[in-house]
Amino acid sequence: MGIKQDNGKSITVTISEGVTGTLEGTILTFKGPKGETSRDFLSPLVKTELKNNEVTVSIPVSKRKYTRMFFTTIAHIKNMIEGAKEGFTYELKICSGHFPMTVKKEGNEVVITNFLGEKIPRRSKIVEGVKLDIKGDIIIVNSPNIEDAGQTAAN
């Protein structure tokens, strides 16, 4: 993934090998070996174009409001390309002191029983499209979408 800045108002991001991109209206989608990510870039401030395996993001003027959306859009695009190519992984360690707790996956939820001695089990949602594995005292969260993987880890 390479980045090329034409001037202060336009940046071109080159799509990595093994990743394909499509732009339908305002929805940008990347497909790669680790999965597919898509996002709606509906912003009147930023213009997004996809040509020749490159995504060009541009703004009409260099004002603070425009540049904030400009660089945020570029960061989202870079994360989407990286997620489609390599994916994002979070590893969480289950630590229990005095009270032995158990963690198991049930459907689209993680159930934590006996957390700090509580009688009622805690349930945390697994965001759709996220793969979660529990191996001993390690929880592994995988997803091509960084936001979904991070939200599942936070839950």
Q: What positions do the PLM features span?
A:
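Ribosome-associated RNA-binding proteins
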Residues: 1-155
